[in-house]
Amino acid sequence: PGTPYLYTALVRFGKDEYRQKFGFRSVEVSGHKFLINGAPFYFKGPCKHEDSAFRGRGYDACVTVTDLKLYEWLNANALRMSHYPYAEEVYDLCDRLGIVVIDETPAVGIGAGTACDPYQTFPLKTYHSAVLRAMIERDKNHPCVVLWSLGNEPDTEHFPESARDYWRPLYELSLIHISEPTRQEA
């Protein structure tokens, strides 16, 4: 974090060339401490949406670079992708700037304010599993990503058994699909 060291892999095939940046880091939880490269790490940073007042929703390179530089100026070191995976270019920038990322699936407020059991009524799990798999597959090689967030503020209070049956397999899926043992889940 803060001062990343990235390597560049170069692949040539005939006249074609492809360059890919990559880095190494370790992540672990020891007791109550979150460690990156063996050192305690304290998450300081915002949740944000990919939008701006003057450009609208979606990825915008100028807005993103400006925002990330402002976060550095504020002494932030982490960014939660709320509440969906961002454009891949954002992860590339976070890799280069040493900003730690909590990657999140687009599962916001499942069941919040509903009278029926959302985990039994709506066919969400198949879609949610597919989105989680796609996010992990796409972002697993970004050294900036240190946590997978399965969702935002789900209602687990009103239907606890259904919620457990819904979230447990997704949590296990995130564990199975981690290609390296140094990624954590939220």
Model-derived regions, located:
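Secreted/periplasmic carbohydrate-active enzymes, especially glycoside hydrolases
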Residues: 1-88, 93-101, 131, 141, ...
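Hydrophobic pocket-lining residues within nucleotide cofactor-binding pockets
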Residues: 27-29, 154, 181
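A short acidic, helix-capping loop that chelates divalent metal ions and anchors anionic groups
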Residues: 50-55, 110-115, 154-158
